[in-house]
Amino acid sequence: MPQKPGVVATMADTRHVHVFDASAVLQVGFRPSPHSSLPQALMTKGPRTTPSKPLFTFKGHREEGFAIDWSSRKPGRLATGDCAGNIHVWDMKGSSWQVDSSPYRGHQGSVEDLQWSPVEETVFASSSADKTVRIWDTRGRNGPQISLNAHSTDVNVITWNHGVTYLLASGSDDGSFKVWDLRAIREASPVAHFTHHKQAITSIEWAPNDDSSLCVSSADDQVTIWDLSVEAEEGPPGDYPPQLLFIHQGQHNVKEVHWHPQIPGLITTTAEDGFNVFKPAINVST
C-alpha cells in the first residue's frame, strides 16, 4: 500500500488474495549489523520472525489471477483481477476491507494487469489476454467507460504516467509496446509504437522523475530504457530506434522492472536467476 508500505497484498493459484502487515519483517531486514555493512537479516541464518496471519483474506475470485494494484490516491483501495476476466475493487473499512459484492466484467479473457489512475481515485485501467485495454470508473457499474483494441496479441502489462496523466503505455505478447493519449483514445491510434523486442513484454514502467522515460523488460532477456522526447530521425530506419537509450542484459527470464521512487535513474529488475539493482550512465532526469 503506497500510504503504508508495510502493508502488502498477495495473490496465488489458490484464488485467494491475502493482505499482510510486513512492517516487522522490513524492520528486521534493514537493521544494521555491527560487524558488516550488510543488513543483519542477510547475515543471520534461520528464521527471524514468526509467521503472521493475514490481516484480511478474500476468497471470491473464481480462478487464480495475476493482476493487482493499490491506489495511490485513496488509502487502502485495491483492485484485483483473475483469469476468468473478473475484477474486484476493495476499500479499507477501519482495520479491515470491504470487497464489492459483484465483480467488474467486460474482458473476454484473463485480466493481465491493473493500474489505478494517478489523479482520479475512482478510475482504473485494465489489460487482458483478449487484446484490449479498458478504462473503468467505480462510480458506474455499466461496464468500462472505454474499450480499446490495443494489440494483436495478449496485452500483458500497462503503466500510467504519473506526470503526464493522460499517457498510458501497454506491452504485448508479440514484443511490441505502445503509448496511448487518453484524450484521443477513441481514435484507437497510439502516439508511439515500438517493436524492438522480439519476445513478450513482461514489465513496463514510466520513470517517476522523468515524464518521457520508460523502462521495459521482455522475455528476450533484455531490459531497455527509452526516451520518448527524442524525435525520429529522417531517412531509412537504423538498427536501433533513436528513442532507445540503454539495453541491460545478463539476466534470464526477467519478470519485473521498477524505478526507485526517490533516486533518479536507479532501476531494480527481478528475474528467474536473481535481481539486479543498477543505474545506467545516462541522464534520464533533469
Protein language model features and the residues they cover:
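Asp-box/WD-like beta-propeller blade repeats and closely related beta-sheet repeat scaffolds
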Residues: 22-72, 98-109
